[in-house]
Amino acid sequence: MEGGAAGGQRDRETLDAVRSVVFKPSVSLEEKRFPRVQGYDFNRGCDLIGLLDSISSTGFQASNLGDAIDVINQMIDWRLSHDAPTEDCSEEERNLAYRQSVTCKIFLGFTSNLVSSGIREIIRFLVQHRMVEVLVTTAGGIEEDLIKCLAPTYKGDFSLPGSYLRSKGLNRIGNLLVPNDNYCKFEDWIMPILDQMLLEQTTENVVWTPSKVIARLGKEINDESSYLYWAYKNNVSVYCPALTDGSLGDMLYCHSVRNPGLLIDIVQDIRAMNGEAVHVGLRKTGVIILGGGLPKHHICNANMFRNGADYAVYVNTAQEFDGSDSGAEPDEAISWGKIKGSAKTIKVHCDATIAFPLLVAATFARKFQERNNKLA
């Protein structure tokens, strides 16, 4: 009995020791800093805005998406009047009406595949209503917008065999299909424009830059489904330092063989692009970047010249471990001075075709609808 009692005592002591290790006392969490995890209750009905309002408390990348919604809304809502006047500011800068008129300048960057997808229409909405001021994309982000005005892109499948598609004159972008005929139509449309641009260069001393070429193409397409048309009409800057890397480059190559002489000056554009950030004055800057690569770096690098952006939202699936710029987190850009150390930043690890429509629905489009409802 004594041995059994002693063994029982040892077991209890062991259990107490185990419990002290396993059940460490918890610190209390402040719900303001650590909100409770809770998902949307569909008993409330299928309410998109209600769902998006609740998404930040869902967890994982849904919470990152919710944080991105918050950061973009801060970009949109910011006014100079939110900050106290500095001691050395002018009388005009102290004027409340003036301070309420000074807004955040929003840069939007996106890769070409997003224009191939239905994200093109969302970009068009933002540009049509002057919700963003500076766009940066790749050559495909220019040509795909124009080509879609001439012929459609189709939804296919990721698994369609390349050799089969090649034999049928079909090009695959993920699960999207672009017929070769689309590029033939693009060539027929753009060659006379390039001829005219060369003539203006020769007879009027016009100095073409990538952004001037893009604006001209937006003017010539004259199609309200095109975001480039609206960028031209609303004087929204569109930059593409890699203008030759795509079908547009193929057209420039062919044109240079048939009718040589057209020159495009990239130096003027880098000065203009950096100036978009340098000359913002008292404004803040916000960056929204879909995907990575050139558009991401070009926007962040321009903001380095003003000691960094004030807000940054990244949406991409790239990872940081390989040292790529595409996968770099906002904190890496802070080390370069491309984003301010005090900036509001978030990266959403998600396909932008999923995340961006939801982001726009909960921010730009929601505010647009609310304004229209007030005017009705």
From Swiss-Prot:
One GO cellular component term noted in the UniProt record for this chain: cytoplasm
Keywords tagged on the record: Hypusine biosynthesis, NAD, Transferase
Pfam families tied to this protein: DS
Active site location: 338
Record's catalysed reaction(s): [eIF5A protein]-L-lysine + spermidine = [eIF5A protein]-deoxyhypusine + propane-1,3-diamine
GO molecular function, one term: deoxyhypusine synthase activity
Gene3D superfamilies: Deoxyhypusine synthase
Sites where the protein binds NAD(+): 112-116, 138-140, 144, 245, 292, 317-318, 351-352
UniProt binding sites for spermidine: 143-144, 250, 297, 323-325, 332-338
Entry's EC annotation: 2.5.1.46
Annotated family: Belongs to the deoxyhypusine synthase family.
Function according to Swiss-Prot or TrEMBL: Catalyzes the NAD-dependent oxidative cleavage of spermidine and the subsequent transfer of the butylamine moiety of spermidine to the epsilon-amino group of a specific lysine residue of the eIF-5A precursor protein to form the intermediate deoxyhypusine residue. Also able to produce homospermidine from putrescine.
Protein name: Deoxyhypusine synthase
Native organism: Musa acuminata (Banana)
